[in-house]
């Protein structure tokens, strides 16, 4: 998701890039660090896809909806706003997320934060991700869809990056509540306004 779907290093041939899938779970950080070492100096194309399990999406959504923490989701009613940057580059993704509807017509969405360990431009980058129920769920497809709606601003991300990783190492995830805006004639550009719903990390 986000830059993780892109190629990390320039290709020397026109061959299709190798795709690695990494599950976003308690072993995710170790796996990503191993990939970082593996990719160092590698000339061939390699793309990384992050798979967010339905069970985790369910846990986060349930914690948000019920206002109750769980073993993996340290929920609280803190509702601390965080800056979201990069939305202007994700307008098509945000439009798809809203199903071409106005952002204000969307319900509040659940979401989470994901540090981007392999980001070649900013090692402290933290992605902001929203969770929705798949529009056409089938037995062979996932119940939930995850979409990246932006990034934390650099200064804020640098302060909490390591703390988020420490939580992930304990198989705990930072829950978000996200309000969508835009998608109208008066305000065509979509926006996503995230609020952190945990007191395990200080974001203020």
Which ranges hold each PLM region?
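Conserved active-site motif detector
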Residues: 2-204
């Amino acid at each position: 998701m986000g830059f993780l779907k892109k190629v990390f290093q320039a290709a020397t041939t026109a061959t299709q890039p190798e795709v690695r899938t990494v599950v976003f779970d308690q072993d995710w950080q170790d796996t990503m660090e191993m990939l970082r070492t593996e990719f160092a100096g590698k000339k061939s194309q390699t793309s990384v896809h992050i798979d967010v399990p339905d069970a985790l999406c369910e846990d986060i959504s349930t914690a948000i909806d019920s206002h109750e923490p769980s073993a993996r989701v340290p929920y609280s009613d803190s509702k601390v706003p965080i800056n979201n940057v990069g939305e202007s580059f994700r307008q098509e993704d945000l439009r798809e997320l809203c199903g071409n509807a106005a952002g204000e017509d969307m319900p509040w969405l659940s979401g989470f934060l994901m540090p981007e360990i392999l980001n070649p431009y900013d090692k402290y980058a933290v992605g902001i991700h929203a969770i929705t129920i798949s529009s056409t769920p089938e037995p062979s497809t996932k119940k939930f869809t995850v979409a990246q709606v932006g990034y934390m601003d650099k200064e804020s991300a640098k302060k909490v990056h390591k703390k988020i990783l420490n939580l992930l190492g304990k198989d705990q995830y930072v829950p978000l509540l996200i309000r969508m805006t835009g998608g109208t004639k008066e305000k065509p550009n979509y926006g996503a306004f995230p609020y952190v719903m945990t007191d395990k990390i200080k974001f203020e």
